[in-house]
């Protein structure tokens, strides 16, 4: 709700996903820029409540799917790469982090949120990504 107030708009929740100690929330504005998608990462504290980690980030749009890397917690090199899928065609992503081996990630049918985790380095990270439909064609 606080984010909606800052955006001067009502927000519509699209997904709330709990994964271990993390909670991810994907949302959009009802009226202003309704085609934008936003994501925020929360972390469970000692009391068992979720606290926001960082601020809401606008996801990068590529056709009918949206992408956003979310960094780790204070010194943690883990990166969570978020894919919000609204495409009926998107089925698979292939990632090559830090010039390492390629990893294939299945994307659930739309609408869906996929979180893929990888390790960055001390000096940051680099990621090549490609997205494919069910016939194996790059999108």
Where do the language-model regions lie?
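N-terminal export/targeting and maturation segments
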Residues: 1-51
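Residues that act as N-cap/strand-start positions at coil-to-secondary-structure junctions
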Residues: 10, 36, 77, 101, ...
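Short beta-strand elements that form the blades of beta-propeller/WD-repeat-like
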Residues: 23-28, 77-84
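Surface-exposed loop/turn elements that mediate protein-protein interactions on large endomembrane-trafficking
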Residues: 44-55, 96-98, 134-136
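Extracellular ectodomain segments of secreted/surface proteins
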Residues: 54-82
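Short, solvent-exposed mixed-charge patches
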Residues: 84-85, 139
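A short, structured loop/turn motif at beta-sheet edges
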Residues: 86-92
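Ser/Thr-rich low-complexity repeats and stalk/linker segments
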Residues: 93-139
